[in-house]
Structures are given as C-alpha cells and as structure tokens.
Amino acid sequence: GGQIGAQATSQWYLDLWAYAFNTGDTEDFMKVCQVEGYCDEFAHDLERMHTDAYLVKPLTNQYLQTKDIYECSLKKDGTEGICIKFTYLQTPAGFRYLTEEKASEQYDTISTVTGEEINNEQRFFRVLFLEERGDTWVVTHIWDH
C-alpha cells in the first residue's frame, strides 16, 4: 500500500509493458493496466503484430528516476489516487514482417522503427495515475510528455 506500493507498481507496469511487447503475452500486464481505451487496444495490437511479424531484437525499458510522487485526484470524477512522474530509457524492438503487406500495417497503440533507428535509445517522461483496488494498485491513466 501507500506511495511505496504505487511506485513499485509503476516500475512493474513498465517491465510488464516491455515483456508484453516482446512476447505478445499480455495476461500479467492487463492485471495492472486499467486505462480505458488503451489497455485492451494495446493487447489487440500486440496480438496482431505478433501474428504478422517475429521479434529479432527485444525492446528494453530501463526505469531511470522517479521525479515526483504525490496524492492526486481526477478532476472529472474526483477519483483519488497517486500520481507518479518518472523518466525511463527505451531501446526499440526489431521485428521482421512475414510479408511486405504486413510491414505497412498501422497500429493505434504501438509504433515500430526500421533501419538505423533500431539502435537509438530514447528517454521518455511519463505520469501514471494509480488507483488502489483492494490490496493492489492499478494504472488507470497515463500522460506522455
């Protein structure tokens, strides 16, 4: 519970996201991802991508630093939770597509890189909103910066 539990969940979320991306196995990820309109779509996109292509170089996420952690609430409905601002480093995955047609497929929640970009690490800044559900934390909103 508390902020320590929420922070651990945010790091776990990032690890599960990478695992799901690399393997197509979203079962554990879906237990902590409860973002309406994103989590189910992400799982569907990954299922399609892993059907259309095969992984040749796994994506990596490295949690760098928690910038801030504080109690917060959603203005829309007053839901209370904990907000976590953090940075992480990502190295993109490499996929080979089964056909040229499949290589041009578009996905709503994931993007792929080609050629030289595959070795470019990128630093990201995210804010997660976590809600306590029973004795566990779940991510219900994500803001990219």
Positions of predicted regions on the chain:
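Core segments of small alpha/beta cavity-forming domains
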Residues: 1-61
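A mature extracytoplasmic/lumenal domain signature
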Residues: 33-36, 46, 63, 68, ...
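A short linear-motif detector with a strong N-terminal bias
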Residues: 40-45, 60-64, 107-109, 117-119
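Compositionally biased, intrinsically disordered low-complexity regions enriched in proline and serine
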Residues: 14, 20, 30, 55, ...
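A contiguous pocket-lining binding segment that forms or flanks enzyme active sites
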Residues: 51-77
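Exposed beta-sheet edge and beta->alpha loop/turn motif
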Residues: 71-145
